[in-house]
From Swiss-Prot:
GO cellular component term, pick one: Golgi apparatus
Disease: A chromosomal aberration involving CHIC2 is found in a form of acute myeloid leukemia (AML). Translocation t(4;12)(q12;p13) with ETV6.
Site (Breakpoint for translocation to form CHIC2-ETV6 in AML): T111, R112
Protein name, UniProt field: Cysteine-rich hydrophobic domain-containing protein 2
Span of the annotated motif CHIC motif (Cys-rich): 88-106
UniProt modification remark: Palmitoylation in the CHIC motif is required for membrane association.
Gene symbol of the encoding locus: CHIC2
Cited Pfam families: Erf4
Entry superkingdom: Eukaryota
Chief place where the protein resides: membrane
Provenance organism: Homo sapiens
InterPro entries associated with the record: CHIC1/2, Golgin_A_7/ERF4
Coiled-coil region list: 1-26
Family: Belongs to the CHIC family.
Length: 165
């Protein structure tokens, strides 16, 4: 009778082990790198629109290309303004003791946030239903020691249907 009001943690351990097992078997994320000629603070002016072979059977190539084109159009709209401010900031940097770089930093952050919002909208609209998650991530470049922003497409683990909430 002493075990009547005792709390057992076995179920929580089983659930945690199941989640770890699902994460262990999910494939590596797909990395979509920038392919533009201009890079401002690690953000390229466009991303590769070539369909990765690891997404075959998960998403239609047309949907992938449409999503990348939306991101590229957002970059095309925002990045020329950032480049102009960067050039102006570099010219005036010595006179203003670096304060002329603040507009570029703020515009770059605004561009990143608009891309993150766009990717979140794409996730909610389509990709979460397909067990995919798109996000903007900072990664080290393959060719040099600098950092760049890439689009990571992660595979979400499917939740088992046979387990109740």
């Amino acid at each position: 009778m002493a075990d009547f009001d005792e709390i057992y943690e076995e179920e929580e351990d089983e659930e945690r082990a199941l989640e770890e097992q699902l994460l262990k078997y999910s494939p590596d994320p797909v990395v979509v790198r920038g392919s533009g000629h201009v890079t401002v603070f690690g953000l390229s002016n466009k991303f590769e629109s070539e369909f990765p072979s690891s997404l075959t059977g998960k998403v239609a190539p047309e949907e992938f290309k449409a999503s990348i084109n939306r991101v590229n159009s957002c970059l095309k709209k925002n990045l020329p303004v950032n480049v102009r401010w960067l050039l102006c900031g570099c010219l005036c940097c010595c006179c203003t003791l670096g304060c002329s770089m603040w507009p570029v930093i703020c515009l770059s952050k605004r561009t990143r946030r608009s891309i993150e919002k766009l990717l979140e909208w794409e996730n909610n609209r389509l990709y979460h239903k397909l067990c995919l998650h798109w996000r903007l991530s900072k990664r080290k470049c393959e060719t040099n020691n600098m950092m760049e922003y890439v689009i990571l497409i992660e595979f979400l683990p499917k939740t088992p249907i046979f387990r109740p909430d």
